[in-house]
């Protein structure tokens, strides 16, 4: 199996990224698909596209996806309160949730911020954040999500990230999309992947925050988030 990663930017600013895990005979078609995705992204036409293809030599772990649930909210205020309620149920203090919203509102990070329950930021590079890599979903899961209208193409990408993150011991994830027209965000916990409509306003940037225990081994967690291969089924 091979990992194909795409990253696109303009004037040094991140525009889009995606990843697939494929068989050797799928590499050419999937690479072409990811290049097209980069060139047609709503955030703009990139002046730099990087495609990285490498063989996966480590055993790939197959895990079940988190249960998908959708919560419909009328506006951002209602949606944020619903997300807060889910996070509170996992023992995350309000002041830490407030800080997470500040990070997301600021925008501009390629990866995720990591907060412990004291509200301390643990990612080594506060500008870059931590990227969850070496992940994909099975074709069957993608078809199920789209056919049963459990979500969109963006949900397919997000459920892969969320399922891996929670499996590795992260308490919860809070995320809104970089796509300025896509206003549905999510909270992921061991209880499920909660899609929340109107978690941001149209035109706003997005962001991602992982909430972890105070005694987390942060170096080990980041290594697994970035390098351990998972396929979500």
Curated annotation (Swiss-Prot):
GO terms for molecular function: 6-carboxyhexanoate-CoA ligase activity; ATP binding; magnesium ion binding. It is an enzyme of class 6 (ligase). The keyword Magnesium applies. Pathway: Metabolic intermediate metabolism; pimeloyl-CoA biosynthesis; pimeloyl-CoA from pimelate: step 1/1. The keyword 4Fe-4S does not apply. Homodimer. Catalyzes the transformation of pimelate into pimeloyl-CoA with concomitant hydrolysis of ATP to AMP. Belongs to the BioW family. This is 6-carboxyhexanoate--CoA ligase. It comes from Methanocaldococcus sp. (strain FS406-22). The gene is bioW.
